[in-house]
Amino acid sequence: MFQALKRDKAFYSYLVRLTAPIALQNLITFSLGLIDTLMVSQLGNNEMAAVTAANVPVFLLISIVFGVQSGVGILISQYWGKRDLKSISRAIGVASFLGVALALVVAVVLFLWPVQIMDLMSNKHHLSLLGAPYLRVIGFSYVFNMLSSIYVSAQRSVENSSFGMKLFGMSTVLNTGMNYLLIFGKCGFPMLGVEGAAIATLLSRVAEFVVCLICALRSRVIPLDWKALARPGGEMLRRFVKYSSPVLVNELFWGLGNSLLTVILGHTVISVEFLAANAVMGNLNRLFLVVCFGLGAATAVMVGKAIGEGQSREELMALSRTLSWVTILVGVVLAVVALALVPLLFQPVIFPLFKLEGLSAHLATTLAVTGFACIPFHAYSISAVTGTLRAGGDVFWSTALDLAPQWLIALPLTALLGLVLNADPWFVSLAIQAESFVKCPICLWRIRSEKWIHDVTLPEGQS
C-alpha cells in the first residue's frame, strides 16, 4: 500500500484539482435531492412516499443520462490525450442524438401512463394518485438534462472539472427557490405540492441547457466543430455503440435493479414507513459518497488520458494501484465519520427535520448504519468499475461486475427477506448492500490481470 501511495506533490495536487470540483458537483446534485425530499416531507409521509415511488422510474432516466455521459467520456478522455478535437465533436454529436431520443421516449411514456406506472411501484393506490402529477412533468426535465450532462462530461474529460460544479450550483439555487414558491404557493404562485417540485426541476434543467449552449458557442478549451457534431459519421457511431452501449446497458439495468429494490420496499408490510425512511437515508448516504464519485470520475479522466498518451502498461498499472488505495482510504475515513454522526445528529436534528418518527425513524437508523458501514466497499467498486475499467475500454467486464452481484445476489436476497420471510429490517438492509461485498474482490482480480487496458481510439483490431 505505502509503495503504491508514494507519489510526488504534483500528482496529488492534480488529483485534488480534478476530484474536488466533481465531488462538489455531486454534493450539489445530491443536496438538490435532499432539499426536494425535505420540502416534500413537510407535506406529510404519504406525499414523501409518493415522490419516492415516483422516482423509481425516474431513476431509470437518470441511469440513461449517466450511461450516455459515462460512455461518451470514455471516448473523449482518450481523444483528449491525442488532442483530437474533431473526433471529440463527433463523439458529442452521436451521444446527443442517441441520448435525447432515449430520454424523450421514456419521458413520453411517463407522461401518458403515470398512474399505471405508479401502481407498479407500490401496492398503495392513493400513493399512485399523489405521485402521478409529479411523474407527468419530471420526465421531460431529463431531455434537457441529457444534453447538459453530455457537455459537462466533455468538459470534465478535457480536465475542466469545475464547469459542472458551477453549472449545477446555479441550477440548484434556482431549483430550491422554485421549489419553495411552487410547492407551498408563496409570493402569489399557486400551491402545487408534489407537482410543483417537478415543475421546479424542469425549469432548472432548461436553465442548465441554455447555459451549456452559450458556453459551447464560446468555448476555447474545446471549440466544437459544429459540422462534425451535426454529422458525426458512421465510424464514430460504430465506435460509440461498441464502447458506450455496454455502459448504457450497464447503467440502465443497474438503475432498474436499484428501482426494483425500492419497489420491493414499497410492497413490504411496512411499505409507507420504509419508503419514507429510504427517501431520507438514500440521499444522506449519497452525500457521504460524493467524494468517492469524484475520485471515480477523476480516475476515469486520468486513466483515459494516460492511455491516449500511449503510456506503458507498467505505468498504467502503477497509476491504477495508487488511485485504488487512495479511494479505499478515503472510504474508510468517510465511513467512520458517518457512523459517528448517527447518534449525534439523527435523534435531535434529522428526524425532526424530515418529520420521521416511530417506525420510520427506526428504519431510517437501520438503513443509515448498514449503508454507512459499507462505504469503503462502495468507494472501491466505484473507482474500479466507473473509473479504471471503463476508462480502460474494458466495458464488458465493467458491465458484468456492476450487474451480476446486484441481479444475482442483492435483488433475490432482498425479495426473499422482505417479501417472503418478512425478516427484521436489519437483515433486509444488509441484503440491499450485499452486492458490494462480492463486487470488490472480483474487481481487484480483473485489474491485476492487466487485461482491462484498451486504446479505444485505434482502428478495429488494434486496441
Task: Indicate residue ranges for each PLM-predicted region.
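N-terminal transmembrane alpha-helices
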Residues: 7-38, 42-43, 59-71, 75, ...
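Short runs within selected transmembrane alpha-helices of multi-pass transporters and secretion channels
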Residues: 69, 138-156, 164-172, 197-212, ...
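Small-residue-rich hydrophobic transmembrane alpha-helices
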Residues: 48-108, 145-164, 275-343, 379-398
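Helix-terminus/linker motif at the lipid-water interface of multi-pass membrane proteins
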Residues: 27-49, 118-125, 181-192, 252-283, ...
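Residue-level hotspots within pore-lining transmembrane alpha-helices
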Residues: 24, 28, 32, 61-65, ...
